[in-house]
Swiss-Prot record:
Induction of its expression: By Spo0A during nutrient starvation. Repressed by AbrB during regular growth when nutrients are plentiful, in association with the transcriptional repressor Abh.
Annotated transmembrane regions: 27-49, 70-92, 112-134, 155-177, 219-241, 248-270
UniProt name for this protein: Sporulation-delaying protein SdpB
Described purpose of this protein according to its UniProt entry: Required for the maturation of SdpC to SDP. Not required for SdpC signal peptide cleavage, secretion from the cell or disulfide bond formation.
InterPro entries the record matches: HTTM-like, HTTM_dom, Sporulation_SdpB, Sporulation_signal_mat
Keyword Ribosomal protein: no
């Protein structure tokens, strides 16, 4: 009974209208916007736009309708770019939320996608849809200090946000466990093959620089660290706020590293947005203090080690010159 009363009290003050939710939506929309800005429909449908069909889908995509009514795919792309720009700047979430999901769904279902990011974007934009429909603000960047919605709406908002967190938890847990079933990941050689892959691998100049490391025994350690780190991110769902913040910073750095190494920018941004809504408190605004626990830990540890090393050095020099 006490737990139920505590939960009821928490929900009664629940207020997700902070910049955490706004940054999540904007990054998620921006990732898809980049795909459409830098890839024409000739690339997105390089397998042949004539093969786009609505026969095997429950909900026809925008490109299915375009083909049916002989509308140029580029017109659809430009329209999507316009709508996603509205999503990124935060205009009228109640109106743009549904279009955001439908754009992600259309790209995932009809276009040529290869890295899995669009599928995650489709799922997340669908799960956040009820929240956007309940968001009556003109812009999702307009922060509300208090949430004056009814208790029923607050309850829906709370459970939807919880479901999204569980979904991100499943993504990381599944990624780690599925790797353990794979022979190359279990043996610790998967990173070598992945970085050498002609599609997802490193650019040639980076590969030449990394080859000594990739061909060494240390690659086994690196490969296993990736799996362990993803298990750590999954386990962070039940950790305290300090661990969550450390996991968030490390997770963002991890995906930034992937972006700069193998160039899957949209996927990286999607996962960073997922980490933000997963690990940062939804009811708190993101400030520069959110990463302070990690940097404070590094600073304190570094300072202690510096003092210890410095002290040992002084003792050594004293013995050397004054003994």
């Amino acid at each position: 009974m006490k737990i139920l009363n505590s939960l009821e009290g928490y929900i009664d003050t629940y207020n997700p209208w902070k910049n955490t939710y706004a940054l999540f939506r904007s990054l998620l929309g921006f990732s898809t916007l980049l795909v459409l800005l830098f890839n024409s429909t000739d690339i997105l449908f390089s397998y042949s736009a004539n093969n786009v069909t609505c026969e095997n889908v429950y909900i026809p995509t925008a490109f299915c309708f375009a083909k049916e009514y002989s509308i140029n795919f580029e017109i659809i792309r430009y329209l999507m770019i316009f709508i996603l720009t509205l999503v990124v700047i935060g205009w009228r979430p109640r109106f743009t939320g549904l279009f955001h999901w439908y754009i992600c769904y259309s790209i995932q279902t009809s276009a040529l996608t290869i890295d899995g990011g669009e599928q995650i974007a489709t799922v997340l934009s669908f799960l956040i849809l009820p929240v956007t429909l309940l968001d009556s603000r003109r812009n999702h960047w307009n922060i509300k200090k208090n949430n004056n919605e009814s208790f029923t709406k607050k309850t829906v908002l709370f459970y939807i946000m919880t479901i999204i967190k569980i979904q991100v938890f499943i993504i990381y847990l599944n990624a780690a466990l599925e790797r353990l079933k794979n022979k190359e990941w279990a043996e610790g050689t998967a990173i070598y093959y992945f970085f050498s892959d002609p599609v997802f691998g490193l650019p040639e100049y980076q590969l030449n620089l990394m080859n000594p490391l990739l061909e060494s025994n240390f690659i086994v350690v690196i490969t296993w660290l990736v799996t362990i780190f993803e298990l750590f991110l999954a386990a962070s769902i039940i950790s305290n706020i300090r661990i969550k913040r450390i996991a968030l910073v490390l997770g963002i750095l991890f995906h930034i590293g992937i972006i700069f190494s193998i160039g899957i920018v949209s996927f990286g941004l999607i996962m960073i947005s997922a980490l933000i809504i997963y690990l940062h408190p939804v009811q708190q605004n993101i400030t520069m203090n959110w990463c302070s626990p990690l940097f404070k830990y590094i600073y304190v540890k570094g300072k202690r080690n510096f003092k210890r090393i410095g002290g040992e050095s002084v003792k050594f020099l004293t013995k050397l010159f004054h003994s």
